[in-house]
Amino acid sequence: MSKTRAQIARKHGAAAAGIPDAASAPAPSTAPRSNGNMLLIAAAATAVLLFGYYHLLALGQMSQLANGLTMPDMMFGGYGAAHIADLRAAMDEDALGQLSYLHKTAGTLFPLIFGIAWLLLIQLNVDRRWLRWLLWLPPLLFAAVDLWENVAVDALLAGSAPDDGQVALASALTVARWVLLGLSCVGGLLAVLLPATVRGKVPVRPVGPAGLTAESR
């Protein structure tokens, strides 16, 4: 009776059975994932620094130029026409120009870099396509809504007095950006903490010294 390749390998060695030796087999390259992890660390660190600078430092300093009034971007629960009217009365042209410049610099860089970092985080940790797109949705929406909110807030404070509809839109965008930022952070945690089987990550089967998996022995 003819012997199987596994039996031949056990008796005469892997070479006799035509099975490549595990020691000589090329190991799977981990360079792409290592490069991705390095990019992720750099992008995430930049996003955290920008968040701290933009929200905690720069917008706080802008409040000092508005008689202590909170900037609309920092009002998690939204705002009304009365608050915008108070801001318009308290801020001169120089202060409004500084806020607009802040929106165009740090206020633009933060959502873009945060979005890139979170997309990469999910890409590296989730292989199941439908789950990946589900987790990608909040950071994509956050970046779009945050950029739109910057324009809406600048429009409220510059030019003629805004109507109630403009204020309601800008307020809704502000609330939405904070909600989406929170959902994005939750999605990032899920991408890392969910079980590998849920994320579609298939563990590599251990290979024995004869190049045989556990199932073939």
How does the language model describe each region?
Residues 7-29:
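N-terminal intrinsically disordered, low-complexity tails
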Residues 31-35, 92-102, 127-134, 162-173:
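Membrane-interfacial loop-to-transmembrane-helix junctions in polytopic alpha-helical membrane proteins
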Residues 142-196:
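Alpha-helical transmembrane segments of multi-pass integral membrane proteins
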